[in-house]
Amino acid sequence: MRYCYITDPGKVRERNEDSVTILKNGDEYLLAVADGMGGHKNGEIASSIALNHLANRFKEISSVGNKEDAINWIQGTVSEANALIYKYVVAHPESEGMGTTMVLAILTPSFLLIGNIGDSSGYVVKNNKLHKVTVDHTLVNLLVKSGELTEEEAKNHPRKNVLMRALGASNNGEMDIFNVELGVQGIFLCSDGLTNMLDDEQIMKVLNEDIDIEDKLEKLIFKANNRGGSDNISIAYLNKEDN
């Protein structure tokens, strides 16, 4: 089992508003990526509030328990993080509009759960291919589902970054949680700073290379920046088959 995470401001943004972590607690793992928004320091604050709360809660417990316990733990912890961001905005009215996406994974010997809110992506690697698990909470995704836009039109739509759900944006902050089969080769989470620059095949080509896991992530950052690096880029990757 090898794992690694990385974050980079990209080539355009002055600040890095992403937060990322991987934590191990006994034989349980938490991976998470948060992509903050709101301008100035606000996005940075929102993503770090959410991720720090999640990480601290994970460190406090001896185990996430069974699958049902873990789902409840995720929803409860994410709801608390949402409330903390909301509380910050009330105390700092100038930061109104700040929020963050979040994608996370919990891996135990018995189950794998992946959750998301916003447009950061959660994938699994299976048969040396990337399979997207999460569904982006974006306006264009809703329009694709309703048949008003095609997948191709959505890729270049001027409002493709408009989120329908994010932490801090409302009182609820509910996360979608997916129960994923355990028999996967790896877990790959990232912010849209990567997926807006590289497609799934380009990402997988690097993950399949015979180089160290750290070098793979460095190479993905380099490639995304080479294509413009228009946003902050964050990745959390766990390879179950790499010893």
Cite the ranges covered by each PLM segment.
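PP2C/PPM-type serine/threonine phosphatase catalytic domain
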Residues: 1-243
